[in-house]
Amino acid sequence: MKLLSLASLTVVLSSVATTFAAKSFSASNLYYAAGLTDSQQTTLLTGLQSAGVKVLRVWLDGQSGSTKGTPINSFNGLQGTGPDDWDDTVLNRLDNFMAKAHGYGIKLLISIHSYNALEGNRDFYGKYYGTGDFYTNTQAIAQFKQRIAHVLAHKNPKNGKTWAQSSEYIFAFEAQNEAMHPQGNKPALQSWQCTMAKSIKDNLQGNTKILVTTGGGSYVDDSLLDGYFSCSSLDVLAIHAYGTGDLNTSKLKPYVEKAKNAGKKLIMQEWGACYTNAANNNCNGGSPLSTSTRDANIKQWAAAIDASGIPWFYWQILPNPDPHYDWDYEVGINDVNWGALKAAGLAAGQAESAFDFSPYLL
């Protein structure tokens, strides 16, 4: 048997490590996806696929009318005026959508609730408990666990499986978008996140092919509270970041190492490039940036996230031209800045990831 020198062995091992390095991916958000018509779905999914997008994050809040310039089929939120007031329209709509998305190589990340709905009193949680008591009241916690159970037990006629079993369609579940925003009681929030993550895990009934994630905060540091790293039920910690100081490799890298040491994965679940010259984390008003300037911002910040080893979800990619409302981060498919975002999405798929998500992607 011929023995390798230490130097030769090092080269071989390095080559093997490079060969099997996990690849990153790009993803997007569309909170009103359940309202899309079939043709809008086709436009969106075709565009996302062309940009290398592997996951789309969707919400279960009700929406109506024209949303972000998209004339949608209106739908109610999952729950209404009381804990027994269920409307499964949003789930039924997403049954069809997730099956169609599968054909484009895309899975869904399901956000089970949003702080936006809580704060806006769009269902009974806000009306009964408000943003203060919702995270600590024992009855509210029990009722929200029932919501989680209801969602995961929902059966999709497209595959005859519950959502908890539908790993071919679903990438991950999160309890709530930007829970307790702003974070007035961090200990209570950390406890709530872990409690709800365990509830999701329990309702997955041993299915480890679907991930459990948080729903982010308003910036990097408050997206990654210390208690999340020690919660055994959380697989993924989600970052939301719009400030330019947060869209920086040197800011993100220490958290990557912290997550790896804790056995967690990270995703940049929300980020965006403002259409105007307003502050990027307060994208209201201001004058439109030149196409080339915004293109450069998109490419620069996406590359910085890629370099940190974190997959990213853009906020948001639309199936129609961006109408340029307030908080204007959106990019429409085949609209201004689409070429830059599409190129960034494809580049993400070639970047190395600090975390191996390949078992959870199509």
Predicted segments with their positions:
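Fungal secretory targeting signals
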Residues: 1-21
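Short acidic/histidine-rich active-site segments
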Residues: 268-271
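Substrate-binding surface in catalytic domains of secreted glycosidases
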Residues: 244-257
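C-terminal helix/juxtamembrane-tail motif
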Residues: 352-362
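Gly/Pro-rich active-site loop or hairpin
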Residues: 280, 285-286
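Active-site mouth of glycoside hydrolases
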Residues: 22-234, 243, 261-264, 275, ...
